[in-house]
Amino acid sequence: MMNDKRIGLALSGGGYRAAAYHIGTLRALNKLGVLKDVDVISSVSGGSILAAYYALHKENYNEFEKGFIDRLQKGVLNSSIIYGIAVLAIILSLATLISFILYQIGICSGICVGVGFMVFIGLIVFVVSKSFTILPISKLVSEQYDKVFFSQAALSDFPEEPMLSINATNIATQQIFSFSKNSIGEYAYMLLNGKSLFDATHFPIADAVMASSCVPYGFTPVTIGEKFRKGKLSYCRYGSFI
């Protein structure tokens, strides 16, 4: 019987385009009377933007859809500005470095040119090694997610039903890393008492969605601060992976 079955909805990724496409999915399910019976939503990347916003505003579908479409337009614009500034900064930096090298070639000996080249390589290595902190693109986008979509909501603000799992990838273990109302993490971060090392109560939804939509090299990884930890690494089964 239908009542004995659970309904799961998977929303895939693809940035803001995927989020826009999934509006059609939810609209169709709502018209069929199925959306209200969905028990579990699993999402990634652009699908997580829509899934998280829907979970917070599911009580009135029409208001949810209108509100999301309005905010989606703002989100696309804001992200375009952020990316534009980042690209411009990179172009200007490279132009400066190239100009420096060409200048050195024009007036210096081979040794001087070699020094200039080594400085150039050193700067590249420095930027790559410190990209977590000096290129906080993910932090900027997360702030925009929060401003446009989530208004400082935390994972604990999600409803009990449908159960929402926002999925990301843990670069330390190469495993699926999930965010939900009552849990953060994966098996490698389970304490000996069977609970997660991380506290989901006050963890920002915007950060969870950013982690889910964090395309490698396009964004910097999202880290989880000490204030969201409930235990010590020495009591974690797989603490060496953290």
Question: How would you name each of these model-derived features?
Answer:
Residues 17, 113-242:
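Active-site gating loop/helix substructures
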Residues 1-2, 32-35, 150-158:
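Surface-exposed acidic, glycine-flexible loop patches that form ligand/cofactor-binding
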Residues 6-10, 15-118, 122-132, 136-139, ...:
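Patatin-like phospholipase
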Residues 2-7, 231:
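A short, charged/proline- and glycine-enriched loop
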